UniProtKB/Swiss-Prot annotation:
Belongs to the bacterial ribosomal protein bL19 family. The gene is rplS. GO terms for biological process: translation. GO terms for cellular component: cytosolic large ribosomal subunit. InterPro entries: Ribosomal_bL19, Ribosomal_bL19_CS, Ribosomal_bL19_sf, Translation_prot_SH3-like_sf. Keywords: Ribonucleoprotein, Ribosomal protein. This protein is located at the 30S-50S ribosomal subunit interface and may play a role in the structure and function of the aminoacyl-tRNA binding site. This is Large ribosomal subunit protein bL19. HAMAP family: Ribosomal_bL19 (MF_00402). One of its GO terms (molecular function) is structural constituent of ribosome. It comes from Clostridium beijerinckii (strain ATCC 51743 / NCIMB 8052) (Clostridium acetobutylicum).
Length: 116
């Protein structure tokens, strides 16, 4: 039974999205339906968690807009996601960055991973 479920899920998983990690700053382009028009809106922020795996995988992006923290959770394989761009790689030592919720200003930043 599990093999059948895995085979069906493997067909439906999106392969056009880049691989990103927790701590990365990403731009998520989301399709929004307003009346009869459809447009694309960008949501940029730091990935604070990734959950599950396979078809049910979700990730949460956090940003601070006008002094207020905004978190948005996206299903990885959702059709509303147009594309994802990685703005910068972050260097973190945790799987969940919930501690960023309590921080303000420069202390809420994630160190950038320098690649050579």
């Amino acid at each position: 039974m599990n093999e059948i479920i895995r085979a069906i899920e493997a067909e439906q998983i999106r392969t056009d999205l880049p691989k990103f990690a927790i701590g990365d700053t990403i731009k998520v382009y989301v399709k929004i339906q307003e009346g009869n028009k459809e447009r694309v809106q960008m949501f940029e922020g730091t990935v604070i968690k990734k959950q599950n795996g396979g078809l049910r995988e979700t990730f949460t992006v956090r940003r601070v807009a006008y002094g207020t923290g905004v978190e948005r959770t996206f299903p990885m394989n959702a059709p509303i996601i147009d594309k994802i761009e990685i703005a910068r790689k972050g260097k973190v030592r945790r799987a969940k960055l919930y501690y960023l919720r309590d921080r303000v200003g420069k202390s809420a930043k994630v160190k950038e991973l320098l690649t050579r």
